[in-house]
Amino acid sequence: EAGGNMLLDGQGAVIVSNVIFDGNQGFDPNLTQDQLEQYFLDYFGVHKVIVTPHLINDGTGHIDMFVKLINDTTVIVGEYENQSAGFSGNYDICNQVANQLANETNGAGRPFNIVRMPMPPYSNGVTYTYVNSLIVNNKVLVPIYGFSTEFANDDSVLALYETIMPGLEAVGFDCNQIIPANGAIHCIATKVPALPETIACGNLMGDVNLDGRVNIYDILKLVYFVTGVIEPELCAISSGDMTNDGDIKIGRASCRERV
């Protein structure tokens, strides 16, 4: 995952909606498909760009309002109960995109598996969505709204997430206050990966991040280790009152084998 209108499969493919070509939405109407593909290749190393239609009148046109990659081959696509359940045209758009992606492959050439997820009914200018969720470690945070119909049901959707994502717990969050602003959980979040990195063993001063310079980024690296934002590859950081002097501070680094 990367952004509202940019879903990466981790294998060199990205799914975006065609709102990116819409000058009325603030984008460059002169942008061509070839230029778009070159931008993704240059900046993200992506070699395959899949462009789908976007929902109508959802406030964003972003792909993450009705499509979600949960791994490199499994794609959730929203589904309305009938033509009248969504804003005019969106029932057909969801089905069109589901069929399009079912005939696509990921960046490694493997076919996508499509899972349809109910879309709550469009109401009072609001496009409700269960698809705009966020995966965090062993949980998936799912927007819920209090729907309990046979088709769009909060509890059933949470169960569906846990079925298609074994080992993860689906946690519902009431998003009635934010969905009128045209987004839910995925729209308002950003992710910081916990990446293995190397620091200078036995030395908490100087060039801690081993980039050949001593600057503010060395301090930030230490803070990131202590707070758990990043995870050390070759060294471990301890924190707290390591010296029993009554003062809690950054402790020492100790070398260890990478696990």
Task: State each model region's role.
Residues E1-A200:
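Histidine/cysteine-enriched polar flanking segments
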Residues E197-R258:
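Cellulosome-associated attachment modules in secreted, modular CAZymes
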